[in-house]
C-alpha cells in the first residue's frame, strides 16, 4: 500500500509473519508450492543500505553483451548441432527480428546429454532455436559491438560485473518477471495466450512444467504467491514497481499484473507506477522507496526485434539520477537482463530444480560500497537480488530459489569502505528526454 517512505534500521527484526499462499496446482505431477517461509539470517554488522533498486532489462545473454570483457568468462565461437565451429559475428543492438526464447528453445539450445531435458548441456543447439523473418544465418551466434553499449561497459568498469549470473527460470519473460518479485511462479512455464496476468480472468491460462520437466496441465495466469511487496507491506517498508502500460493496463513486464493481491487491491494504483520515467521525476523530487523495481518501455528494453538502441542510455540515466541524488550513499542498484533472449552463451547452467537454472545473463551491481571494477565469478541467479533485499531488510525467504541463492553482499560489496563519490555515466540523457519519449 502507499505509505510514507521509511528509513530502515539495518537488519531489523521482522515483527509480522506474512502468510504463505501458493497457487493450487495439485494436479501437476511433482508440483509443490513455495516452502514454509524462513527467517532471513542476519549477516552481522550494520548495512548502510536503505534503498534497493532492481532495474530489469530484456533478453540478452552474458556473452551477447560482454563478449571479450577483461577477466570475464566469454567466448568468440560456438558449435552447432552438426559439430561445426561457428565464429561469432557482430550484431547491432537495434534489430527487427527476434529469437525464440521459450522453454522449447532452452531445451534445444542446451542439447542435453541426459534424459532430463535441459540438463548436462552440450551447448550446441543454438542453431535449432528458431528466429523471426529476416534473421541471418547463425542468428544466435552473435555479440553486440561494445561501442553500441558503452554505458554498460563503463558501469562494469566502475562497479561490479558478475560473470556467473544465471536466470532462476529456464524460459522467457513472463515467468522471469515473477521471479524478480516472488522467486517462484507456481510451476508455470512460458507465457499465457493473451493477457499477461490477472486482467485476462479465468480464461487466460498458462501451461505448467512438472518436476520431470514435462509439460503439465494449465493454470490461470494470476498467482497468489507471497512477494517482496507483500512482505514489505507487512513490515512497514515502502515499495514501488515502475512499468509501462498496454492500452491503459499493465505492460508485459509488469510483474504485479499477475499477482492477484496487488492487481485486485489498492497497491495496483498506489505502488505500481507508470510510466517508467516517473521514477526520474520521483527521485528528482526527493522520493525513493525502500525497494524499487524499474522495467522499461519496449523501446528502452534491449529486447531484440524492436529495432531500438536506447536501452544503454536509459539505464545510464537511471543510475545517474540515483548517483546525483541525496540517496546515493544509502542505495544499492542491480541491473539485470531477465533471460538469455535466444543468444549464444558458452557457460552451462547448473540443474537446480524443474525450472532452473536458466542460461547465463548479465548483472551489474552499483553502489558507493560496490567493489571497484570487480568481476565476480561467484554463482548468482535472479533470486540473489531478492536474497539481498531479504537479508538487508530482515525479510523472510519466499521460496526455494531465494533460499538457495547467494546474497551478493559478502562478495561484491564492502560496507567498511568510505562511500565512493558518484561519477556520472557517459551516455545518460536528461529526464525530459525520456518523459517526451513516452508521450
Regions found by a protein language model. Give the residues of each.
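C-terminal motif of bacterial Sec signal peptides marking the signal peptidase cleavage site
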Residues: 16-19
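N-terminal pro-sequences and low-complexity stem/linker regions of secreted or lumenal proteins
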Residues: 21-439
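Bacterial N-terminal signal peptides that target proteins for export
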Residues: 1-9
Amino acid at each position: 500500500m502507499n505509505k510514507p517512505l521509511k528509513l530502515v534500521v539495518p537488519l531489523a527484526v521482522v515483527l509480522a509473519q506474512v502468510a504463505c499462499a501458493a497457487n493450487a496446482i495439485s494436479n501437476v505431477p511433482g508440483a509443490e508450492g513455495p516452502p514454509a517461509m524462513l527467517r532471513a539470517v542476519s549477516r552481522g554488522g550494520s548495512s548502510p543500505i536503505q534503498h534497493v533498486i532492481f532495474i530489469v532489462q530484456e533478453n540478452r545473454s552474458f556473452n551477447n553483451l560482454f563478449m571479450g570483457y577483461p577477466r570475464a568468462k566469454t567466448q568468440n565461437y560456438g558449435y552447432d548441432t552438426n559439430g561445426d565451429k561457428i565464429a561469432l559475428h557482430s550484431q547491432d543492438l537495434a534489430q527487427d527480428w527476434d529469437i525464440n526464447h521459450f522453454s522449447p528453445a532452452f531445451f534445444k539450445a542446451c542439447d542435453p546429454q541426459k534424459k532430463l531435458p535441459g540438463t548436462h548441456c552440450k551447448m550446441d543447439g543454438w542453431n535449432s532455436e528458431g528466429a523471426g523473418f529476416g534473421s541471418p544465418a547463425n542468428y544466435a551466434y552473435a555479440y553486440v559491438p561494445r561501442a553500441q553499449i558503452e554505458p554498460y561497459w563503463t558501469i562494469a568498469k566502475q562497479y561490479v560485473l558478475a560473470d556467473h549470473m544465471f536466470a532462476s527460470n529456464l524460459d522467457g519473460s513472463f515467468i522471469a518477471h515473477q521471479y524478480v518479485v516472488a522467486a517462484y511462479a507456481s510451476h508455470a512455464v512460458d507465457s499465457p495466450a493473451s493477457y499477461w496476468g490477472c486482467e485476462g480472468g479465468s480464461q487466460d491460462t498458462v501451461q505448467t512444467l512438472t518436476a520431470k520437466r514435462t509439460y503439465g496441465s494449465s493454470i490461470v495466469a494470476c498467482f497468489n504467491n507471497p512477494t517482496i511487496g507483500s512482505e514489505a507491506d507487512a513490515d512497514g517498508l515502502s515499495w514501488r514497481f515502475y512499468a509501462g502500460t498496454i492500452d491503459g493496463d499493465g505492460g508485459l513486464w509488469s510483474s504485479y499484473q499477475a499477482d492477484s493481491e496487488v492487481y485486485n487491491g489498492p497497491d495496483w494504483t498506489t505502488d505500481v507506477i507508470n510510466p517508467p520515467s516517473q521514477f526520474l521525476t520521483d527521485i528528482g523530487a526527493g522520493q525513493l522507496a525502500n525497494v524499487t523495481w524499474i522495467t522499461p518501455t519496449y523501446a528502452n528494453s534491449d529486447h531484440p526485434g524492436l529495432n531500438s538502441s536506447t536501452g544503454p542510455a536509459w539505464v545510464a540515466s537511471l543510475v545517474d539520477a540515483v548517483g546525483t541524488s541525496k540517496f546515493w550513499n544509502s542505495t544499492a542498484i542491480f541491473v539485470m537482463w531477465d533471460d538469455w533472449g535466444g543468444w549464444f552463451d558458452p557457460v552451462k547452467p547448473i540443474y537446480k530444480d524443474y525450472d532452473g537454472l536458466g542460461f547465463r545473463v548479465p548483472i551489474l551491481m552499483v553502489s558507493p560500497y560496490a567493489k571497484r571494477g570487480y568481476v565476480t565469478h561467484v554463482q548468482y541467479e535472479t533470486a540473489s537480488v531478492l536474497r539481498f533485499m531479504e537479508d538487508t531488510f530482515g525479510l523472510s525467504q519466499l521460496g526455494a530459489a531465494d533460499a538457495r541463492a547467494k546474497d551478493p553482499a559478502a562478495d561484491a560489496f564492502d560496507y567498511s569502505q568510505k562511500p565512493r563519490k558518484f561519477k556520472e555515466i557517459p551516455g545518460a540523457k536528461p529526464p525530459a528526454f525520456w518523459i517526451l519519449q513516452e508521450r
